[in-house]
Structures are given as C-alpha cells and as structure tokens.
Amino acid sequence: MKLTCVLIVSVLILTACQFTAAVDCHSTGYLCFWWHECCSNFCIPLQQRCF
C-alpha cells in the first residue's frame, strides 16, 4: 500500500512538472529548472522549447 501511494504521488508530481514546464516554456520562455530528470534541463529564453 505504501509503495502504491509513492507511485501515485510520483506520477502526479511528474505530470505537474511536465505541465508546468510546458506552460512556462510556451508562455514566458524563461529559464526553468526542475528536480526530476524529466525536467532537469532548461528552457532557452524566448525559444519556447525545453531542452
């Protein structure tokens, strides 16, 4: 049960991380750094892309 909870929370955080990164990149283009490897890279200013 504990493992299931951890997995669910991890998926939610991962989804929120990706969604936030997409919003930040496409709406502002500012640098954005994330704790998870899926979002550990940054958005180049004004390029509106995550690398």
From Swiss-Prot:
It comes from the Eukaryota. Expressed by the venom duct. One of its GO terms (molecular function) is toxin activity. Disulfide bonds join C25-C39, C32-C43, C38-C50. Its main location: secreted. It is found in: Secreted. Keywords: Disulfide bond, Knottin, Neurotoxin, Secreted, Signal, Toxin. Residues 1-22 form the signal peptide. GO terms for cellular component: extracellular region. Probable neurotoxin. The cysteine framework is VI/VII (C-C-CC-C-C). The presence of a 'disulfide through disulfide knot' structurally defines this protein as a knottin. Belongs to the conotoxin O1 superfamily. This is Conotoxin Cal6.32. It comes from Californiconus californicus. The lineage of its organism: Eukaryota, Metazoa, Spiralia, Lophotrochozoa, Mollusca.
